[in-house]
Structures are given as structure tokens and as C-alpha cells.
Amino acid sequence: MSEEYYPWGGEFTTCDSKSCVAVVLLNTEYVPSDKVAIYGPLKTENIGVEKIVANTISNPNIRYLIICGEEIRGHKSGKSLVCLNKNGIDETNRIRDAPGAIPYIENLDKEAIERFQEQMEIIDLIGITNKEEIDKIIENCLEKPLPCFGDSYIAIRIAPEAAKLDDKRALHSNIIVDYLGKVKKRGE
């Protein structure tokens, strides 16, 4: 592993730091070839998404982010990552249009999110688990690499602020989620 990349840690495997492809694994045992830069699971639509963003933007060679496997029930972390790349966050740090139960980005600044949106081309293979199909998409991306995105970007973790009673951000203890993972009520 190249020491200058992937500063936020997490559960992942590094391969070729010069590769333009990173792979996010949702609920799958699939293992990509060692031609990718990094791969690993995504479990949650908040901290997990933050780590994927921070770690992938640290390597400017990564330009394609392939998300594959079956969606995580309730969390919808894969779709939340897709929505973050496409739509960003609102003024309460909620990922716009994300279907997850608690899709809030609380530890990254807007600059890191904008870098993620500009640097990454998302390849949405959510629901696809066929190894040959995923391998083919990876090979297609490797055959048409996008140029390096400039210098490495190291996202700095935002220090948490104390929440106030009238704060509209997610106060996790005040969110009621049904058994399917749908938010039924948010605290006021």
C-alpha cells in the first residue's frame, strides 16, 4: 500500500495504486482482480460512505468507482453513495435523495464532497453479483483510463459540534425506523 493514500482506514484491500478503478462491495463475496486500486465492503450509509469518499479521493489515479452486489437492506448504502456523487448534500448534511435510514455526512466538508463528485465516475452495478459481468466492466474501465485528477486530496475529519435542540441535523436517538429500514419519524 502506498503510504500517502487511504488515510481514513477501514476494511479494504489495496492492489495497484496507479489503477483508475476502485470497487465497492455490497453484501457479496466477490473479489476483483489485483488490477484495481482498492476494494472493500460498504455497510453503512453514513460513516461507511464517508470513509469511501475520503479514501478514494486521496488517490487521484482512481477515476471509476464501481459499486456491485446486493444492496444492504435498511441502510441502502450503495444507493446513498450513488446519490452523494450525483446530488451532494443539503444544508443539514443529508445526502440528497438518498434512500438510506440515516444518510448524513457529518465528518467531511463540502470541498471533499465536491472533489468526490468531480473526480469519480460511478458505475452503478447494484444488484449485480455475477463475477464475469463485473470483471468485464472493470476491464472496460481499465482499457479506457481517465487522466490522473491532479494532486492527492487528504480530507480532514470535521470536529463534531454540539447539537442544539432546534438543530435539524440527524439526532440519531430521535429517528424512528420501521422494520424495512424506512424512516417513519424524525425528532423535531
Set out the residue ranges of the language-model regions.
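Generic detector of well-ordered alpha-helical segments enriched in charged/polar residues
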Residues: 53, 82, 114-117, 135-139
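Well-ordered, non-membrane alpha-helical segments in soluble/globular domains
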Residues: 46-52, 101-106, 131-135, 139
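Conserved mixed alpha/beta catalytic, RNA-binding, or beta-rich assembly cores of soluble enzyme
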Residues: 2-96, 172-188
